[in-house]
Amino acid sequence: MSADYTEKLVTSRTGYEGKLLTLKEDEVRLPNGSSATREYVLHQGASMVVPLFEDFSLLFERQYRYPVGNHFLELPAGKVDRGEAPLAAARRELIEETGYVAERWRHLATLYPSVGYSNERVDLFLAQGLKHEGHPGADGEFLECVRIPLDDALGLVAHGEITEAKTIVGIFWADRLRRGLG
């Protein structure tokens, strides 16, 4: 049996509360009895879609990400609204951002991308049987949809041209599925 390294909450302070994030600062008691400060971000969670066509190409979005000041190729994703199921969020994001709907959905994995400073959870969903039904363009989002063959996407990861973490995981999942491992 492994040791219990659970930290116990002593005090908690909210430093900022916004629409998307809450910044917390907690004092905790460590297993050895000393205390420490933990700064972290609360996030209501997100869903990401791995839109996989029959020919094993993927549907990406190219968009500007303000916090890092650069454009990124990403798989469709977005926050889960309060009271919304992760699959419902994935379906909503796919149609809003790309104009596509999917006949078949499957939960692939759950990720915690930054456990050292955030509770953000991202659920990954495979979307297949894709059909274009609408025009993308959620309010306030400016992006370009790009269809890329899986082998090319793997090459973009290998050459450092796709660097967004959850997208890389989604590409690797698509490759596993193609090889019959998922």
Regions found by a protein language model. Give the residues of each.
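Conserved hydrophobic/aromatic beta-strand scaffold that supports enzyme active sites
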Residues: 20-27, 60, 124-126, 145-147
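C-terminal boundary of histidine-terminating zinc-finger modules
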Residues: 171
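Unchanged
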Residues: 36, 45-48, 53, 79-165
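Extreme N-terminal tail/first-helix region
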Residues: 1-17
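Generic C-terminal helix-cap and adjacent flexible tail
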Residues: 176-182
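Hydrophobic residues on conserved beta-strands that form the core of alpha/beta folds
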Residues: 23-25, 37, 61, 75, ...
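A glycine-rich, hydrophobic loop/mini-helix early in the fold
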Residues: 46-70, 74
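Acidic, metal-coordinating catalytic segment for phosphate/diphosphate chemistry
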Residues: 13-48, 54
